[in-house]
Amino acid sequence: MPGFYDLFRPLIFKADPETAHQLTLKALKSGLLPPCATIQDQALEVKLWGLKFPNPIGLSAGFDKNAEVIGPAFKMGFGFVEAGTVTPKPQPGNPRPRVFRDPKTESVINRLGFPSEGMNAFKSNLESFLDSRHRPPGVLGINIGMNKNQSEPAKDYTALINMLGPMADYITINISSPNTPGLRDLQKREPLLELLAAVMNERKKSCGDHPPPLLVKLAPDLAEDQQEEIAKTILEAGIDGIILSNTTLDRPDSLPGDFAAEKGGLSGQPLAAKSTAIIGNFYQLTGGKLPIIGVGGI
């Protein structure tokens, strides 16, 4: 017997990708989607950073940018949910259309540009979830980024940690989206050192006796020398973990020409091999000392 997704997939794929995403969020918020059958087994539990993950499968940032459906996402069986990317001030992101998909190659290209309702709205949504009587088990991550026209990135990241850090189980510093001008420049050694020092200091000031772990989300398009430099910098700074990877600017030959011509970051199946390779590289470069969350092409 076909499942719910099998029945509605043709309708979903007839809609514009971003519209389909928004309709999915509304359905989750309203409880229209049927509950998923989930299995909790101690064999799947992962203990890390003093946190207990019910299982190692999480929902990556980008799905729930404004922390609207954290509860429903946990009820789908995820061991952790990473909400965001959130920016301090509200911003619309880039003009639509800005999300494109190619079902045959299981690929998506986006140039969203951090659309966000801002940290005040995000905090309000988080409070509603955290205050709920029936909060499901799981680990809550918050992915933070800078506003498009911010010339001093550390100010945005520290403001976000100040407001949202005490509410997070872990925080992800997003410096790898290809759709915000200048963001990937923060992966260079000196800007990265400066930023990490600022966020580490703000965490110490704002997050009390049990500060959330800080993770850095990186791009898959880094050259070998860049990877070595970043690994060294992250270890020096005392960051708690790495997320690999964000979307890629590469365009494999397998992609249709008109689809490949769209600007933005590529995700989906074509990213899998590249993302997996850079995970292995950073594991070696850090000597296995830092936990790595793998994302991209799953």
Task: Explain the meaning of each model-derived region.
Residues 39, 89-98, 119-121, 179-212, ...:
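Active-site-adjacent beta->alpha loops and helix N-cap segments on the catalytic face
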Residues 66-75, 158-159, 222-236, 284-288, ...:
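Catalytic cores of alpha/beta
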Residues 25-39, 178-191, 232-290:
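Glycine/Thr-rich beta-alpha phosphate-binding loop at enzyme active sites
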Residues 52-58, 135-144, 204-222, 284-294:
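Short beta-strand/loop segments at the ligand-binding rim of alpha/beta enzyme cores
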Residues 3-46, 110-115:
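An N-cap/entry alpha-helix motif that binds or orients negatively charged groups
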Residues 84-139:
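A gly/proline- and charged-residue-enriched helix-loop-helix capping module
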Residues 16, 59, 81, 122, ...:
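Conserved, mostly hydrophobic/aromatic
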Residues 146-158, 185, 191, 215-236:
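Active-site glycine- and acidic-residue-rich loops that bind
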